């Protein structure tokens, strides 16, 4: 870089750190005049030139310190500029580095933005999950409050339950009693219906005391037509009921035997208790008089009331049938 400054009679140049000072045109050399006849003019010119040189020297002497100060300032500025240039070079290098760094940072920023997008989506999902969880918590809280309320009511409910249980026990007992009473009423109704048809009831059986005498076989056929048989006797109480109801009249009962010397049996297939039956025969009976007394009847008004007789004789008769509950 070259800087030129003008002075009245000097030329000043700064080239890097080299400084030169010279007049624009070298002074004319002294010597004999080349042009004859012009000596005064030349002399005058020389004088003027001398004066100019003297003035230049004086001016240089006066201005030189100032110029030197300026040069010093210029050097300082040059050094500053050089430092700045170096700084600019360093700065350029840093800029390049920073540019590369910025590119890398741009990539990183893009990656960070992508990560932020992912994080944002995850955050939204998490937010949704938290909202759902909060809703569930509210539901659970309400449920817990309801449970707490119910827990507070448990003692009262337990007391009510115990009362209800006791009441249910009573109700079941009453229902049982009601069912039993209903069955009893139904049984009584069934009995009354049969009794209204001329039958008598005793300990689970119906007995029909006929008004018309028949032979033993005809009497049995009549009983069968009424869903019954000639009566059997299985206990002392039944024997007592029969002879008392008979009132001293003779009634065929279901006693019969097979053959001349056969064993006695009940026509309704009730097992015949020979040992027990001994107490129910009239003393001396059965005697099978005439060898044809194969059927039995009630003759005497006492426990010992049975008598054997011919089956073709006609007597009143007693039919017997068990009580069977009617359909609901």
UniProtKB/Swiss-Prot annotation:
It is a single-pass type II membrane protein. Residues 145-190 form a coiled coil. Exclusively expressed by Langerhans cells. Expressed in astrocytoma and malignant ependymoma, but not in normal brain tissues. Keywords: Coiled coil, Disulfide bond, Glycoprotein, Lectin, Membrane, Signal-anchor, Transmembrane, Transmembrane helix. GO terms for biological process: defense response to virus; immune response. Disulfide bonds join 223-319, 295-311. GO terms for cellular component: clathrin-coated endocytic vesicle membrane; early endosome membrane; endocytic vesicle; external side of plasma membrane; plasma membrane. InterPro entries: C-type_lectin-like (IPR001304), C-type_lectin-like/link_sf (IPR016186), C-type_lectin/snaclec_domain (IPR050111), C-type_lectin_CS (IPR018378), CD209-like_CTLD (IPR033989), CTDL_fold (IPR016187). It is found in: Membrane. The chain crosses the membrane at residues 44-64. Changing residue 313 to A: Loss of binding to 6'-sulfo-LacNAc and 6-sulfo-GlcNAc. Its main location: membrane. Residues 1-43 are cytoplasmic. Residues 65-328 are extracellular. Calcium-dependent lectin displaying mannose-binding specificity. Induces the formation of Birbeck granules (BGs); is a potent regulator of membrane superimposition and zippering. Binds to sulfated as well as mannosylated glycans, keratan sulfate (KS) and beta-glucans. Facilitates uptake of antigens and is involved in the routing and/or processing of antigen for presentation to T cells. Major receptor on primary Langerhans cells for Candida species, Saccharomyces species, and Malassezia furfur. Protects against human immunodeficiency virus-1 (HIV-1) infection. It is linked to Birbeck granule deficiency: A condition characterized by the absence of Birbeck granules in epidermal Langerhans cells. Despite the lack of Birbeck granules, Langerhans cells are present in normal numbers and have normal morphologic characteristics and antigen-presenting capacity. Homotrimer. This is C-type lectin domain family 4 member K. It comes from Homo sapiens (Human). The lineage of its organism: Eukaryota, Metazoa, Chordata, Craniata, Vertebrata. The gene is CD207.
């Amino acid at each position: 870089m070259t800087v030129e400054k003008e002075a009245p009679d000097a030329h000043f140049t700064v080239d890097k750190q080299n400084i030169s000072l010279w007049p624009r045109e070298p002074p004319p050399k002294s010597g004999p005049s080349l042009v004859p006849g012009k000596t005064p003019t030349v002399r005058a010119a020389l004088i003027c030139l001398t004066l100019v040189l003297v003035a230049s020297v004086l001016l240089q002497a006066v201005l030189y310190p100032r110029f030197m100060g300026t040069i010093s300032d210029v050097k300082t500025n040059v050094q500053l500029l050089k430092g700045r240039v170096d700084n600019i070079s360093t700065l350029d290098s840093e800029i390049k580095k920073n540019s590369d760094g910025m590119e890398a940072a741009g990539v990183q920023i893009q990656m960070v933005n992508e990560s932020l997008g992912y994080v944002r989506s995850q955050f939204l999902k998490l937010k949704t999950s938290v909202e759902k969880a909060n809703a569930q918590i509210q539901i659970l809280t309400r449920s817990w409050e309801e449970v707490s309320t119910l827990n507070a009511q448990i003692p009262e409910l337990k007391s009510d339950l115990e009362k209800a249980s006791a009441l249910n026990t009573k109700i079941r007992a009453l229902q049982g009693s009601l069912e039993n009473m209903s069955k009893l009423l139904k049984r009584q109704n069934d009995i009354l219906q049969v009794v209204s048809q001329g039958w008598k009831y005793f300990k689970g059986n119906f007995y029909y005391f006929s008004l018309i005498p028949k032979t033993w076989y005809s009497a049995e056929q009549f009983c069968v037509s009424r869903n019954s048989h000639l009566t059997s006797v299985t206990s002392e109480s039944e024997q007592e009921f029969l002879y008392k109801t008979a009132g001293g009249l003779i009634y065929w009962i279901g006693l019969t035997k097979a053959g001349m010397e056969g064993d006695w049996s009940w026509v309704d297939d009730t097992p015949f208790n020979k040992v027990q039956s001994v107490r129910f025969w009239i003393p001396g009976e059965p005697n099978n008089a005439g060898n044809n007394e194969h059927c039995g009847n009630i003759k005497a008004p006492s426990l010992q009331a049975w008598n054997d007789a011919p089956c073709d004789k006609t007597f009143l008769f007693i039919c017997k049938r068990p009580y069977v509950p009617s359909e609901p």
